[in-house]
Amino acid sequence: MAFPAPAFSLANLLNGSYGVDTPEDVERLRSEQREEAAAACRNYRPLPAVDVSESVSEDAHSLQTPDGAPAEAVSDEFVTYGAEDYLEKSDDELLVAFETMVKPMRIGQLWCPAFNKCSFISSIAMARALLLAPRTSHRTMKCFEDLVAAIYTKSDFYYSEECEADDIQMDISSRDVPGYSFEPWSRTSGFEPPPICEACDMIMYQCPCFDFNALKKSCAERTFADDYVIEGLDGVVDNATLLSNLGPFLVPVKCQYEKCPTPTIAIPPNLNRATDRVDINLVQSICDSTLPTHSNYDDSFHQVFVESADYSIDLDHVRLRQSDLIAKIPDSGHMIPVLNTGSGHKRVGTTKEVLTAIKKRNADVPELGDSVNLSRLSKAVAERFFISYINGNSLASSNFVNVVSNFHDYMEKWKSSGLSYDDLPDLHAENLQFYDHMIKSDVKPVVSDTLNIDRPVPATITYHKKSITSQFSPLFTALFERFQRCLRERIILPVGKISSLEMAGFDVKSKYCLEIDLSKFDKSQGEFHLLIQEHILNGLGCPAPITKWWCDFHRFSYIRDRRAGVGMPISFQRRTGDAFTYFGNTIVTMAEFAWCYDTDQFEKLLFSGDDSLGFSLLPPVGDPSKFTTLYNMEAKVMEPSVPYICSKFLLSDEFGNTFSVPDPLREVQRLGTKKIPYSDNDEFLFAHFMSFVDRLKFLDRMSQSCIDQLSIFFELKYKKSGEEAALMLGAFKKYTANFQSYKELYYSDRRQCELINSFCSTEFRVERVNSNKLRKKYGIERRCDDKRRTPTGSYGGGEEAETKVSQTKSTGTRSQKSQRESAFKSQTVPLPTVLSSGWSGTDRVVPPRERGGVTRA
């Protein structure tokens, strides 16, 4: 089928339809070449018999198979004979050699042609073999580097007749054209290194002394070849790329250049930041487009609304004790984020907040499972667990060690918190069924667009005291290390020193993924799950008396929140803060997965707590309904499944190695966190910065291929634009560069508050009044031993004054009254106020910011 050529016009030239190889043109050219090759084979005539040494030619066009000749299949295997020295080189050295020999063209982060390790080494081996073979052709073969590039790109091995090596050195230099000078042509990659600052030795658009706006003056005269983007390519196309695409069609075109207007600089160069490419407004626009319900979210007074409104809840067996509550939590203030990403304030564990969290996290246990024989089925599930995951020989030969050393490490870790060997209790004398309870003050970021209709509920923690946990944690830590050493090779638990999400030699591309989302995981566990854990712990080598003892005080427990005055009984559900939480959740998830799916069909299986992820070459086959009918879990098979586990995406680089990338959506939300305490030397902010840098250490491994993978996975998981994920990576690169850039994201209004609270007025008169009614009205009464600052009036804007109160202990009502009166006399109460505006009065109390000032004692 013939495709008509587009008509020549400036519009077709600009939109890329004239002079640019479109997919249709490429297919047309390839079909014509195939037809010519087939015609050449049909018209083949055998040559007369002559001497082989004189007639055999190495021309690529003469090496065609005649009709009727035995055709041998060409092997595409990895050819390495003659290139053993390159097999010993590292990947970085091969990349340098690839750039030197093949000289690929760079378009942003994309190489053309792309790098392939096997093809590159095979090309080197074939080039060496061709150079050593006897030459019978009259044409000149290319030099070694150009020959490797020709083999890699599947082009001609010989120089063309017009541009042979001898002519390039002789004819061009001998030409005498007035006004022109000719030099030998050399292949360039098109890569321009970034400018380096001489002062701080950093990339100039990352250093503080770089003035990006000043460079705009040198770019006043521009053409469409400098800034115009051809469809199908990303980034700015330079002159070399444009000429290579348009070719000779640019010759008859007469372009008239006109000077562009002077760019308007909105921000003076001396006030500009380190870079103009990523700024705070761009990051906020990404948040607004990706999380539309988060941009206007402000929960500053949400908990106040909850505490002051009517409250109704339905709970069974709840005990409330409101006599010894902690009314206020000391807080020195927090840093205020510049970005509005939907992050909430810290939650205070009040009675209503704790009851709401218990209702969601601990109460209302679902009953979705069927009636089964618990003892028989739990043994069968444990047996399937060992068959699917455990290497029996390794389990038999491994030892149960490091218990005592783990105990000493735990004691050293919490030594600063006051834990010592003398404080360790006798566990037989302790009631281990009593657990302390608290809520997490930090709420997990919400990635769904529901913040406008739903208020996130904090998670709960059920835990023993450190003196009790210190005696169980070393045992389970040593048992978990033994469990990891006995796992099969394809099973990965990404925790500890011997395992992580970094998988060398495993590529996640072209694999089927299976991700199971288990909801209400902790409170859905019952007696069946407890029996499964008991059999598995005994099989791993845990002493049977300890296993039996541990399971007994998990059958029925009592939790109590001392701060909120709330307590309630619970049964078999998971204790979210004891020494066995992570280990137990991982065992339960693995046992459920092995019963619902055949683990032999997966190449890799990853488990971490209630998260699971499997990779297979074929679509996974199993029965996920058993998660609900047998294990009482609300399970959801994620469709479409992507390599995502532990809030991280798994990506593969060009060398077939897999590494983890934190979820960009959650990382952007963390940039607007409101939990960083205020400090004068920014020590807490710097700690968050170092944590941010550690989480984003993967940025140096992000090539264009990895960015494309992340964009695709991001779109599949969140149904949002993948281009936003690439923009987030640019923001992460800026804010991990140095601490000064990271400080742009937060500020503190503490100095601003000091300016507001400090006021000076020339006409300001205060009268002290000794009145019992006013003393009760302003709440100034306090006890003799109270060292706290005297509370201010109802205006809330005045500055409190320190008052020294006699510490002499007195008895009787008369002595206490005299001390209260003396304390009141030293307090300054601004009652009648005369201002320059002429307003005065004593009938009401007006805030100082409305009157014009405050007073200090």
Swiss-Prot record:
Domain RdRp catalytic, which positions?
Answer: 511-624
Q: What PROSITE patterns does the database record attribute to this sequence?
A: RDRP_SSRNA_POS (PS50507)
The organism's place on the tree of life at top rank? Viruses
Q: What is its EC number?
A: 2.7.7.48
Q: Which GO terms describe its biological process?
A: DNA-templated transcription; positive stranded viral RNA replication
For this protein, the record's InterPro entries field holds: Bromoviridae_RdRp (IPR047309), DNA/RNA_pol_sf (IPR043502), RNA-dep_RNA_pol_alsuvir (IPR001788), RNA-dir_pol_PSvirus (IPR007094)
Q: What class of enzyme is it?
A: transferase
Molecular function (Gene Ontology), one example: RNA binding
The answer to whether keyword rRNA-binding applies is no
List the Pfam families. Answer: RdRP_2 (PF00978)
Chain residue ranges for the region called Disordered: 785-857
Keywords recorded for this protein, A-Z: Nucleotide-binding, Nucleotidyltransferase, RNA-directed RNA polymerase, Transferase, Viral RNA replication
Query: Biased composition, Basic and acidic residues: where in the chain?
Result: 846-857
Q: Where is the composition biased (Polar residues)?
A: 804-816, 824-840
Reactions catalysed, semicolon-separated, are: RNA(n) + a ribonucleoside 5'-triphosphate = RNA(n+1) + diphosphate
- Subunit note: Interacts with replication protein 1a.
Protein name as it appears in the record = RNA-directed RNA polymerase 2a
